């Protein structure tokens, strides 16, 4: 059984085939909060471009939903293969998939069809687990093979899943005449983990895709996707916004911030003034305006970031909503908050419930009227889109 206090970090990086605007690989991940499960799916549609993307999207969506419903591996594969539309040119339907189901008790189940084998690492060493082969017997899919395995993960374990655009990269080149292959990919990952034992899922996945692109002389011959699942110590963050409803609770809020183990963000001038006063610390204001839409940040001993309140948090909502792997975050206050949120796993929001009369102006957007609404939108995005552990408390 997996140790308590282990966070499951999931990230996928992708690069399109050279000259293609749409990726034919699709990655989906969902947290089944009520069951404490995380389900991850990577699918590679036949061909390239729009057709491949449609096949992969259909496959990944079905696989994700069926896995959430605890359907058997053979049944999942059977339904997917029978449902995919037939290609008008090749007269066949085809899409690969890898499904990883991480249960709350720690057991991991992997289901694969025609994707490169999922690589599992314990620290910087490959972990060998027994795989089962299921041969399908239905008339339409007779002879097709599905591979499954289960294992109990430990802290610092990693799983690396990819499409064949990674393992076949470099094919025909002097360095890799038969492609990079599982052996080359495994050696590369061992080197990366050895150099940086706490390398994040995002960074490792990004480096794998970058190397595959390099293998193909920066002209990828196929869509390349790599997803990494990393079991590690959670990174904690506290975000406080708004003064307490009762002034008598000011000291309680300040003590909460001072005693928190992890990164700390304060959003709101009144809130930061209260905490600085209660802790006897000085706030230093910056006069740089990297984002013309927002007031500049401030700093205080023991706090990682201090920003203005509602306007900044509203922009955080917009950035998180539109965020994807191609977005480059700037240096503005909202961008800095998003960066800290992305780098954290367990995020605790403390929302003060005293009404700030400045935000009751009817000319302001409705979303600015109640900070609780804005914070709840941030929390929902963090949970659903970024698989973060989020808690809210009101004071």
Predicted features along the sequence, with ranges:
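C-terminal catalytic subdomain
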Residues: 167-255, 259-261, 281-395
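His/Asp/Glu-rich metal-coordinating catalytic cores
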Residues: 100, 105-110, 115-120, 127-158, ...
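Short active-site oxyanion
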Residues: 107, 259-264
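Acidic loop->beta-strand submotif enriched in PP2C/PPM serine/threonine phosphatases
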Residues: 20-35, 131-172
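Primarily the active-site beta-strand->alpha-helix module of PP2C/PPM metal-dependent phosphatases
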Residues: 26-81, 160, 171-187
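Catalytic core of PPM/PP2C metal-dependent serine/threonine phosphatase domains
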Residues: 55-124, 146, 199-229
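Conserved beta-strand-loop-short alpha-helix elements that form
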Residues: 36-48, 112-113, 151-175, 229, ...
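Regulatory cytosolic signal-relay segments
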Residues: 1-23
């Amino acid at each position: 059984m997996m140790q308590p206090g282990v966070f499951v970090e999931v990230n996928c990086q992708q690069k399109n085939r050279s000259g293609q605007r749409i990726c034919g690989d699709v990655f989906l991940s969902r947290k089944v909060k009520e069951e404490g499960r995380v389900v991850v799916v990577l699918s590679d549609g036949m061909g390239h471009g729009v057709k491949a993307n449609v096949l992969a999207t259909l496959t990944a969506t079905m696989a994700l939903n069926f896995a959430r419903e605890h359907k058997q591996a053979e049944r999942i594969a059977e339904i997917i293969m029978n449902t995919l539309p037939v290609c008008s040119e090749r007269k066949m339907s085809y899409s690969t998939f890898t499904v990883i189901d991480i249960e709350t008790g720690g057991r991991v189940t992997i289901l694969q069809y025609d994707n490169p084998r999922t690589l599992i690492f314990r620290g910087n060493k490959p972990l060998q687990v027994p795989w089962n082969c299921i041969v399908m017997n239905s008339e339409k899919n007779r002879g097709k093979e599905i591979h499954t395995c289960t294992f109990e993960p430990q802290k610092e374990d990693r799983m690396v899943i990819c499409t064949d655009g990674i393992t076949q990269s470099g094919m025909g080149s002097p360095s890799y005449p038969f492609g990079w292959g599982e052996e080359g990919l495994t050696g590369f990952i061992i080197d990366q983990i050895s150099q940086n034992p706490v390398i994040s899922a995002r960074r490792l996945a990004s480096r794998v895709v970058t190397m595959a692109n390099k293998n193909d002389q920066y002209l990828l011959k196929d869509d390349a996707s790599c997803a990494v699942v990393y079991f590690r110590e959670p990174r904690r963050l506290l975000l406080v916004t708004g003064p307490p409803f009762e002034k008598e609770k000011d000291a309680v809020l300040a003590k909460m911030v001072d005693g928190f183990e992890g990164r700390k963000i304060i959003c709101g001038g009144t809130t930061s003034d209260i905490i600085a006063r209660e802790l006897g610390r000085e706030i230093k204001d910056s006069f740089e305006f990297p984002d013309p839409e927002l007031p500049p940040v401030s700093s205080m001993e023991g706090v990682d970031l201090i920003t203005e309140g509602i306007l900044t948090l509203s922009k955080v909502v917009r950035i998180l909503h539109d965020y994807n792997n191609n977005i480059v975050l700037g240096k503005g206050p909202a961008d800095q908050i998003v960066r800290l949120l992305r780098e954290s796993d367990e995020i605790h929001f403390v929302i003060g419930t005293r009404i700030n009369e400045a935000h009751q102006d009817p000319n302001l957007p409705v979303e600015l009227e109640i900070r609780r609404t804005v914070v709840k939108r941030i929390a929902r995005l963090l949970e659903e889109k970024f698989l973060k552990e989020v808690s809210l408390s009101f004071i």
